[in-house]
């Protein structure tokens, strides 16, 4: 009963959050931040959290130089946490591993979060960001979940002017990619 009550509480919280995001009632607190500092802080937190769960974590920053991004730090952290939470939920290897890579792709930075979990079938992959979509395997598992976590992630990334997608190989793992536009100062002509 306790576990079911917790699951219901989580579902209510996710539905409330999704409703606020969907109706543009969530207040975003955008700030200009250093991409390097922000993602290194995220990586430090993930390293501790995943280490406590005996899951390997590798962080790599491939950006040649630091740049600024305009983000809501709390909401972007929610994106990363939701993706990592999904990876952990469906991790089926005794030696779980999660990777986080930051890359420079023109006017954007690209964040890649990969795992060595069970992967997602090609049939299900196009729908994983749809509201309430759950794969047949997750519906039949004891893993729980509401089917709105990744739709929340997609909405937040899009509200940041970005895009999100995934690649996956069954039995080998999944990688989620999202891009966030770099901050660029526009010179003012005098």
Language model segments and positions:
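Short alpha-helical segment of the dimerization/phosphotransfer core of two-component systems
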Residues: 3-8
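Conserved micro-motifs of the catalytic ATP-binding
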Residues: 23-28, 66-71
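A conserved beta-strand-to-alpha-helix junction within the catalytic ATP-binding
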Residues: 29-47, 102
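Short conserved segments within the C-terminal catalytic ATPase subdomain
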Residues: 49-60
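Short helix-loop "hinge" at the ATP-lid/N-box region of the Bergerat-fold HATPase_c
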Residues: 87-88
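Short conserved segment of the HATPase_c
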Residues: 120-132
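Conserved glycine-rich
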Residues: 161-162
């Amino acid at each position: 009963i306790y576990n079911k009550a917790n699951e219901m509480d989580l579902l209510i919280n996710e539905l409330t959050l999704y409703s606020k995001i969907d109706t543009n009632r969530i207040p975003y607190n955008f700030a200009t931040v250093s991409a390097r500092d922000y993602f290194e802080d995220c990586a430090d937190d993930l390293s501790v959290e995943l280490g406590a769960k005996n899951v390997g974590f590798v962080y790599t920053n491939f950006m040649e130089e630091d740049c600024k991004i305009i983000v809501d730090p709390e909401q972007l952290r929610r994106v990363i946490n939701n993706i990592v939470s999904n990876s952990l939920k469906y991790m089926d290897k005794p030696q779980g591993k999660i990777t986080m890579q930051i890359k420079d792709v023109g006017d954007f930075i690209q964040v890649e979060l990969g795992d060595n979990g069970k992967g997602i079938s090609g049939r299900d992959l196009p729908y994983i960001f749809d509201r309430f979509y759950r794969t047949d395997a997750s519906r039949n598992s004891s893993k729980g979940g509401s089917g709105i976590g990744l739709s929340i992630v997609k909405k937040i990334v899009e509200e940041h002017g970005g895009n999100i997608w995934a690649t996956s190989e069954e039995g080998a793992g999944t990688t989620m990619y999202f891009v966030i536009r770099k901050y660029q100062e526009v010179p003012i002509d005098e």
